[in-house]
């Protein structure tokens, strides 16, 4: 039995708890470019108070540079997950299952691979080839503990318990969200499935509209289901992220992943081009997300807020250190009969001073390179 004094104590404690909760400061909404330059197809994972991210690395090796952060804004490199390969790597997915870290990734050969590690700092395993087609893999653990890999066009493939092989054939379970026909896009192109569970719902976050078309092409679309395999219900607030006009600061916003922090704040991480600066590639951006009363994510601020640029800034001077396993993270290196050193431009304009010491009979040069069809420079 509760006497009068105990009841007053309980009620006072509840009142203090209610006031404390009401006065707890909310996190400042984020609307920030955290990786300026060409850091496309971001995938992000939270493990306690730590965040890990990697991006498409294409033809540059060592590949899949893994980054670490504790505040989602400032990032440090900690490992490269793939040492070498004869293919291009793009649109990976990083996840953690039963204490082990996984990165699933597709290649230009139409194949999907996975690498694993006990710690995100590595060492990472040799790539394991999966009998899974498609691109843009997205891993999910279902309510019964079974593992699945989603790929583009709404397909899902069951995996073995260790996540290292397909356990069945792909099945189409999602048709995407039909955006208005009058929108100017590159095509429908349902891709980039990223999945997570919140409460009783599984959420499927995808990209549509094409990533390199007109400024208004790309978008982030959300669907949900009580099952990891659907059926999927599209959000009435779609698209979560989209460029509506060529006048906006960022073009072709898309390829998003939703992530929370330990305090319960939610964010969407995605990529986009700077207005009229396709040459800088697709930067990685983060924005704050809030939840509606009926459990749909929406942006905290859709328009009007000033964009901030944090992340990878500072001195880009470089002295080659062959003993550094990361090869200084702002640079990539390749080895043939010589050495290729590359870095990503993050500014609208810049100056480059290069000093070479070349042995007799050798050659050196400096190039601006976007892809195999767009580059110029000089060597001698």
Segments the model singles out, each with a brief description of its role:
Residues 63-66, 112-116, 155, 219-221, ...:
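A short loop-to-beta-strand structural motif that recurs across blades of beta-propeller domains
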Residues 2-11:
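Bacterial N-terminal signal peptides that target proteins for export
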Residues 188-244, 251, 374:
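Loop/turn-rich, solvent-exposed surfaces of beta-rich toroidal or solenoidal domains
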Residues 69, 117-118, 159, 225-226:
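Conserved Ser/Thr-centered positions that define the repeating blades of beta-propeller domains
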Residues 21-22:
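C-terminal motif of bacterial Sec signal peptides marking the signal peptidase cleavage site
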Residues 295-380:
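Extracellular glycan-recognition regions
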Residues 25-46, 59, 72-96, 122-141, ...:
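Surface loop/turn signatures of beta-propeller and other carbohydrate-active proteins
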Residues 34-35, 40-60, 79-82, 90-108, ...:
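Hydrophobic core segments of beta-strands in well-ordered, beta-rich domains
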